[in-house]
Structure formats: structure tokens, C-alpha cells
UniProtKB/Swiss-Prot annotation:
PANTHER family: ABC TRANSPORTER ABCH.3 (PTHR32114:SF2). One of its GO terms (biological process) is double-strand break repair. May play a role in replication. The lineage of its organism: Archaea, Methanobacteriati, Methanobacteriota, Stenosarchaea group, Halobacteria. InterPro entries: P-loop_NTPase, Rad50/SbcC_AAA. It comes from Halobacterium salinarum (strain ATCC 700922 / JCM 11081 / NRC-1) (Halobacterium halobium). Belongs to the Sph1/Sph2 family. One of its GO terms (cellular component) is cytoplasm. This is Smc-like protein Sph2. Residues 153-295, 355-517 form a coiled coil. Pfam families: AAA_23. Keywords: Coiled coil, Cytoplasm, Plasmid.
């Protein structure tokens, strides 16, 4: 038999997981007051473990107890016992569950292997009541079984968080790119300033050379030079302070404009937390109502289908004809025939049962209509909820920004007051210097004084150029930093987008993986078991409503469906599609087990629980049970199977551990 690629991948993964455990180690299970068991202590080895025994020997009770300590549904307690216990020693760790019967219910306490009850009940404990097996036997919803462990709510919340983060990063990138647009003009300005500064330095150098040629009094020349230098320095300082004051005033005015705009926007916002709470409360009620309606519709549909089968099956043992069954009227009109009701035992005409079924069908239609209305209202409320949340978030942002603006305006006012005082001081010192220079009018009129004044002006001009050039260089350095930040943000944005795509397709990917796993394993199983006339059993993914995070899940109410197909083959080798109902009980049980195996692998259950429990395989013949167990053993490090003696004898191999089942207490 050629192994499918998907099956090979899963075998490799399970093999890697098995290597992480002590594969020579044993699993010890102790159970007390579980089902028909008073007390038992069993040890299992890695590989296949067979619980060999007849019915009523406690095999199923032990498996149910083991499922409970693994993390599954609590088992049934023995008789009238009020307390029970299951203990599991595995891989160096002891797990336990204590069960107490209280007020008609069983309460559990202790440390199970996992808190994921759904994984254990769906894909680990494959007893007669396993949902995957029942879904095939009862023609149930396969997708619901396989996809039940997926937390769509968590996926939705993660998508919303990623969208918010992506939008925030996008806004920051756009702001940075607006700033980067200034690079060309700043670079050009830097080139101009460097050129102007070189020219200014050259003029200063030439003027100083000219001053050295004058034969003026050195002390007097030095005194006037110092005075003029101080005068120009004070002018430069005064201009710098004036520029700073102008900048602070412009910034304060811009803040006040922004403050006014935000206050106007906040006044225009109309929102109500009470309305949001009302919507959330209503959403909770409607969601609960939708689940309740879905359950009711499923239950009523099952009742209608069951009773339709009974009414249409004249040979049903549950419908026993009354004394008037052989009357001429009954033969002419079978619907008037009286039968014994299979629920209460009274005599009733068939047409009354048919009428009751019509009433139930009408009720199912009413419930479906009501569910559709509820789903529509849920969608509308979720849209309103999102709009309100966005408005409230914007209002909070405005309030926070207004608070920041108020603080900034107060800070600007304080800075302006300090700068005004500083400007007055500089004015005073400047007046004193101007008075000193004016007293030396005669010297100022000389050529020497004019040249010193020109030198002072050039040095002042040079200082202005250096200051502006330094500012331009700082702005260019900031643009370099912003460019690096933009590149990092774009990389982060790409990662977020990739995760968004992954989250949005996660449901579909899981569905397709589950279907591929089922189809591949089913193909291999059919090749191994060789059922007559069955060429193929496969699942087709039927598109339904797509998962939409902005509307809280699947729009329209119906998700994707898994449709099971059966292809048979005539004696001449011609294939044709048959119905699922045509499958024998044995074939249905095998299909159900493969559905559970697909879920076990797709959801990586073996990473948490490297164990699988099989029971109620009597519908399958012994040779096929042996082949099935051998196949499943490749995917479960510990496979525990409850079998009748004649079925257990068909299993061979040194790796199979047989445990005689005699756990049930004698009454």
C-alpha cells in the first residue's frame, strides 16, 4: 500500500512527539467506584493495549474513568456511591480526579492531564457515544464535530487587534513620509548655507588683513573693537531671543486653534455608554437565544426524522397494530389503522401521529424563521456596537489631547514670560553699549571704525549662518532617523498583514486540512480493510458564509458544510455514487473512527494527550478490527482498545499488550 503524503507527515510528527516521552515508561491507572468498578489498578505500556473480556466486565467503565482523568467528561459513579476517584501516573507526573455526587450531579476536583474537555471527548475517547462516531451513524454535522475546538471568538478578537495596530502604524508611516518630503529643500538649503559661510569667512579674513595695515593706537583700537564686538553680540542675542519668543507665540497660537477645533468636535459627538451597555446586553441575550434555537431546531428535526422513519416503516416493532388492524376499513384506509403509541402505550390512529408530525414540522419552520430574525438583529447590533465604540474611543482621544494641549499652553506662557524678562535685560545692556560707542563719534567717523563695524557685522552674519546651518543639519539627521523608523514600521506592517491573512484563513485552512486528512486516511483504511463494493468514501467542502471578523463571525448564519460522499463499484468495475445511508453499521463505525482520527491529528491532540481509547467495535469483524487497530497505532503513542476475546485473539505481534478485563465488582 502506498502511503499518502499527509499520512506520512502526521506519522513523522507523532513519531517526534513519542521520542520526547519515555517510550519505555508505563502508564498506571487506578480507578475506584467508577461505573461497574469498585476498585482496580491497571498498567499500560506504549503501543497497543487490549482490554480483553466479555461485556459487563468493566472495560468501558475503565475507559470512561481514564477519559475523565485525561480531562474529558466525568464518568458515571458506581451505584449509589457518593465519591469516586481516578488516578493516572504518566511520564513522571501524577494526575488525579476526585468525583463527588451532590444534588443529583457529579462534581470533579483535582488535576486532569488537560483542561480541554472538548479535545478528549471528541478525539481521544472513541467509545460508543463519541460525537464523531455518532455523527456518522446518525448522519450528523461533520464540520461541527471536527471544528468544535476552534475558538472563533479569539480569532475575531486577534483580527480586530491586528487591524487597529496596522491602522496606527499606517498613520505613523504617512506622517513620517510627509516629513521626509522636506529632504530635498533642506539639502539644497544646506548647500547654500555652506557656500555663504565660506564667502563670509573669506570676507572676514580680507578685512582683518586690511585692519592690520592701519597705524592706530593699539589700546584705543582694541577698546573700540571690543565695544563693537559686544554690541553686535548683544544684537545677535536680542534677535535670537526675539525669534524664540515668536516661535513660542506661534506654537501657542497653533495649540489654541487645535484646542478650539477639538472642543468643537467633542461638542458635536453624541454618544452614550448606557446605549452601548444596552446593546451589549441585548447581544448577549440574542446570542444565547440563537444557540437555544439551534439546539431546539436540531432536537426537533431529529424527533421528526425518527418518527417519520417509524411511521413509514410498517414493519417496525415499535408500532404494534391494535385489535382493529385486520378490519376492512383499516385495509382500505391504512392511515385510519390504530396502533399502539411507542411512548405512552395508548391506542392511536396513524393519521393522528402524522398530524402531530406536521405540527412539529411547522414548529421547526417557525423556529428557523425566528433564528433568522435573531441573526439579522445580531448583525445590526454588532454594527451599531462597533460604531459606538469608535465614537467613544474618539471622544476619549479628544479629551486626552485637550488635556495635553492645556498643559502645553501653560508651559508656553511660562516660557514666554521668562523670555520677555530676558529680552528686557538684553535691551538694557544694548543701550549701555550704544551709549559707550556714541561717545567716540570721532573714532567712529574714521575709516578704522567703519572697518571694525563692518567686521562686527560680518562676524554677526557668520554666527547667524552657523546657527541656521546647525539647525538644518539637525533636521536632516532627524529625517535620517525617521527614515529608519519608517523602514522598521513598514517591516512590522508587513508582518501584521501576513498574520492578518493567516488569521483570516485559519478557519478555512483547518477545514481543508481536516478534509485532506480524512480523505487520505479513509483511502488507506479502505485499502487495508477491503470492504466489498466500496471504491471511495470522501468529504467535500461545501462553501457557506465566509468568516467575517467585523460582524462577529459567519454572516448569514450558515458556515461551511462537510458533505460525505460514498462511491461504490460494480462487479464490472464501474463506479457510481451511493448514499451514506447505504453504508452498513460496520462501515459507518469505521468512517466515524477515521473522522475522529482526522480531528486528533489536525488539532495536534497528540501534543497534549498521546493516547487514544477505542471501545464498542463489535460491529466490525475481527480481522478488520486487527487491521484498524494496527493502523491507528501509528498515530497514537498509547492505544487502549476494549475487545471481546474472539476479537482480541485476532490481534498479533509482540508489541501488543493484552490485559484481561475483570474489573467489574461482583454483586
Amino acid at each position: 500500500m502506498e502511503t499518502n503524503a499527509v499520512s506520512l507527515i502526521y506519522r513523522c510528527r507523532v513519531g517526534e512527539r513519542m521520542s520526547q516521552h519515555d517510550t519505555d515508561g508505563r502508564v498506571s491507572v487506578y480507578a475506584e467506584n467508577i461505573g461497574g468498578i469498585s476498585q482496580c489498578d491497571v498498567t499500560f505500556k506504549p503501543g497497543v493495549n487490549v482490554l480483553r473480556g466479555r461485556n459487563a466486565t468493566g472495560r468501558t467503565s475503565l475507559l470512561n474513568g481514564l477519559a475523565g482523568v485525561l480531562g474529558g467528561t466525568a464518568p458515571v459513579l458506581k451505584g449509589d456511591e457518593q465519591e469516586a476517584e481516578v488516578r493516572l501516573e504518566f511520564n513522571g507526573t501524577t494526575y488525579d480526579q476526585q468525583y463527588t455526587r451532590k444534588n443529583g450531579t457529579v462534581q470533579a476536583a483535582g488535576q486532569p492531564v488537560t483542561e480541554r474537555r472538548d479535545l478528549v471527548d471528541l478525539f481521544v475517547c472513541l467509545t460508543a457515544e463519541n460525537p464523531a462516531r455518532r455523527a456518522i451513524v446518525q448522519d450528523g454535522n461533520l464540520r461541527d464535530v471536527i471544528m468544535r475546538p476552534v475558538d472563533t471568538g479569539s480569532i475575531q478578537r486577534r483580527i480586530e487587534d491586528l487591524q487597529s495596530e496596522r491602522n496606527r502604524i499606517g498613520q505613523r508611516i504617512r506622517a513620517i513620509e510627509d516629513d521626509l518630503d522636506q529632504r530635498t529643500s533642506l539639502t539644497s538649503r544646506k548647500t547654500t548655507l555652506v557656500s555663504d559661510l565660506d564667502e563670509c569667512d573669506q570676507e572676514i579674513e580680507e578685512l582683518r588683513n586690511q585692519l592690520e595695515q592701519f597705524d592706530a593706537d593699539p589700546e584705543e583700537a582694541e577698546e573700540i573693537e571690543q565695544a563693537l564686538t559686544s554690541l553686535e553680540e548683544r544684537k545677535q542675542e536680542l534677535e535670537s531671543i526675539t525669534n524664540r519668543i515668536r516661535t513660542q507665540e506661534d506654537t501657542r497660537e497653533a495649540l489654541r486653534d487645535e484646542q478650539s477645533e477639538l472642543q468643537t468636535e467633542r461638542e458635536a459627538i453624541e454618544t452614550s455608554e448606557e446605549e452601548l451597555k444596552r446593546i451589549e446586553t441585548r447581544l448577549s441575550e440574542l446570542t444565547s437565544r440563537e444557540r437555544s434555537l439551534a439546539t431546539t431546531i436540531n432536537d426537533l428535526s431529529a424527533i421528526v426524522d425518527f418518527n417519520e422513519d417509524l411511521v413509514s416503516n410498517a414493519d417496525s416493532d415499535l408500532l404494534r397494530s391494535g385489535d382493529a388492524a385486520e378490519s376492512p376499513v383499516s385495509k382500505l384506509n391504512p392511515m385510519s389503522e390504530t396502533v399502539e403509541c411507542w411512548t405512552c402505550g395508548t391506542e392511536v390512529e396513524r393519521n393522528r401521529i402524522a398530524g402531530r408530525l406536521d405540527d412539529l414540522r411547522d414548529l421547526v419552520d417557525e423556529k428557523r424563521t425566528e433564528r433568522s430574525e435573531v441573526q439579522t438583529e445580531i448583525e445590526e447590533l454588532r454594527e451599531s456596537q462597533q460604531e459606538l465604540q469608535e465614537v467613544i474611543h474618539r471622544r476619549d482621544e479628544i479629551g486626552q489631547r485637550l488635556s495635553e494641549i492645556s498643559s502645553e499652553i501653560a508651559q508656553r506662557d511660562q516660557t514666554l514670560e521668562s523670555l520677555s524678562e530676558e529680552r528686557e535685560d538684553v535691551h538694557q545692556r544694548l543701550s549701555e553699549l550704544e551709549e559707550f560707542v556714541s561717545e567716540r563719534e570721532a573714532l567712529q567717523e574714521s575709516e578704522l571704525t567703519e572697518q571694525y563695524q563692518q567686521l562686527s557685522e560680518l562676524e554677526y552674519q557668520r554666527g547667524q549662518l552657523e546657527e541656521e546651518l546647525s539647525a538644518v543639519r539637525e533636521e536632516l539627521a532627524e529625517l535620517d532617523r525617521l527614515e529608519n523608523e519608517r523602514d522598521q514600521l513598514q517591516a512590522q506592517q508587513d508582518e501584521i498583514q501576513a498574520e492578518l491573512v493567516s488569521q483570516r484563513t485559519q478557519i478555512r485552512d483547518l477545514e481543508e486540512s481536516a478534509i485532506t486528512a480524512f480523505n487520505d486516511h479513509m483511502e488507506e483504511i479502505l485499502d487495508v480493510l477491503r470492504y466489498k463494493n466500496i471504491a471511495r468514501v470522501w468529504i467535500e467542502r461545501k462553501e457557506g458564509a465566509e468568516f467575517n471578523s467585523s460582524h462577529g463571525g459567519y454572516r448569514g448564519g450558515s458556515a461551511t458544510k462537510f458533505e460525505l460522499h460514498v462511491v461504490r463499484e460494480t462487479d464490472e468495475g464501474r463506479g457510481y455514487e451511493d448514499t451514506v445511508q447505504s453504508l452498513s453499521e460496520s462501515e459507518r463505525e469505521v468512517v466515524g473512527l477515521v473522522v475522529a482520527l482526522a480531528g486528533y491529528l489536525v488539532h495536534d491532540v497528540y501534543e497534549v494527550i498521546p493516547m487514544m481509547l477505542l471501545d464498542s467495535l463489535e460491529a466490525i469483524d475481527a480481522d478488520r478490527i486487527a487491521a484498524l487497530v494496527d493502523y491507528f497505532a501509528d498515530y497514537a503513542p498509547y492505544l487502549i482498545v476494549a475487545l471481546l476475546p474472539e476479537d482480541a485473539d485476532a490481534l498479533g505481534g509482540d508489541e501488543t499488550s493484552v490485559v484481561p478485563a475483570s474489573f467489574a465488582s461482583e454483586e
